[in-house]
Amino acid sequence: MAENKHPDKPLKVLEQLGKEVLTEYLEKLVQSNVLKLKEEDKQKFNNAERSDKRWVFVDAMKKKHSKVGEMLLQTFFSVDPGSHHGEANLEMEEPEESLNTLKLCSPEEFTRLCREKTQEIYPIKEANGRTRKALIICNTEFKHLSLRYGANFDIIGMKGLLEDLGYDVVVKEELTAEGMESEMKDFAALSEHQTSDSTFLVLMSHGTLHGICGTMHSEKTPDVLQYDTIYQIFNNCHCPGLRDKPKVIIVQACRGGNSGEMWIRESSKPQLCRGVDLPRNMEADAVKLSHVEKDFIAFYSTTPHHLSYRDKTGGSYFITRLISCFRKHACSCHLFDIFLKVQQSFEKASIHSQMPTIDRATLTRYFYLFPGN
């Protein structure tokens, strides 16, 4: 019989039916104007592919910050974080409190570390007089590329973390490569850097091996801000206000199209695996430029040539774990150790794995954030 040759999968059928019912319900809510969405959000919802409408609705409700919106999202969208439509199936093991509570460094620990490691750590300015600034650039919507669902969670999370660490955060969204470069130059020229002790630059978008994509990017007409350009904008020649101060660059973006996992045998013999020729650093150039480019450290969400993954209803795995590690360990660990803990959280490989990567590190001392001081 036909039904024996093609047995139904009842759970799959029920899941699909549930999605259809939910989408129809959301369409009625939007059409009846019960939730009073902005006109641009309505248009975005109506123009979206049917399979994407639920995620467009989530983003629109997140902007409202209303009690009704919160109840709707909690009721309909509380699902397993590892099952989101082609996104990475990575285990989110960190407890919720670690994402919301920043552990503070006690005055005694602050005094001890400053006394014992005076020559080894970057000096921290007094909280009352310093003017720390941070810049977040996030591209979510693109003319030719897919929408980055869940990116709003990354903005909210990183902004909250940096504010808790004492930074005044500037957020810019939906920029072309030229627009990103212009915003960075304006940020680098801020007078507040003179009385600051450090800065954070957070870049979140689609990406390529050598740069971060602007909103107009396509294969035919690239719109990419080269990573080299960022270093040039903030180096000691062009940004004297941050000279000899830590400049931390966080990048959430793909750096190629390969997945980050491979299969190996449980054996001590060398394994054959897919490889690529990475560009070689030129030692002479590094020495020549060391006095110009110094006190940087970049932390990328993945290795060169590989993908980076994002949960449509919770944000990117990299940013989520980064925030968690900062909130738990910034009270006692310097920056490099915090980054190492983020990498360790990705150490167990799974399908669609990624490995965050520290790059272009020219810090000459340990950078402690000393939250609470």
UniProtKB/Swiss-Prot annotation:
Compartments reported by the entry: Cytoplasm, Cytosol; Cytoplasm; Endoplasmic reticulum membrane; Mitochondrion
Pfam family membership, one: CARD
Annotated effect of mutating residue 64 to E: Severely attenuated LPS-binding, LPS-induced oligomerization and activation, and LPS-induced pyroptosis
Phosphoserine: modified positions: 83
Tissue specificity: Widely expressed, including in thymus, lung and spleen (at protein level). Very low levels, if any, in the brain.
Keyword Protease: yes
Its EC number(s): 3.4.22.64
Catalytic activity annotation: Strict requirement for Asp at the P1 position and has a preferred cleavage sequence of (Ile/Leu/Val/Phe)-Gly-His-Asp-|-
Post-translational modification, as annotated: In response to activation signals, undergoes autoproteolytic cleavage and activation.
Origin: domain of life: Eukaryota
Complex and partners: Heterotetramer that consists of two anti-parallel arranged heterodimers, each one formed by a 20 kDa (Caspase-4 subunit p20) and a 10 kDa (Caspase-4 subunit p10) subunit. Upon direct LPS-binding, forms large homooligomers, resulting in its activation. These oligomers are often referred to as 'non-canonical inflammasomes'. In its precursor form, interacts with TMEM214; this interaction is required for association with the endoplasmic reticulum membrane. Interacts with CASP1. Interacts with NOD2. Interacts with Serpinb1a, Serpinb1b and Serpinb1c; these interactions regulate CASP4 activity.
Name of this protein: Caspase-4
Gene it is expressed from: Casp4
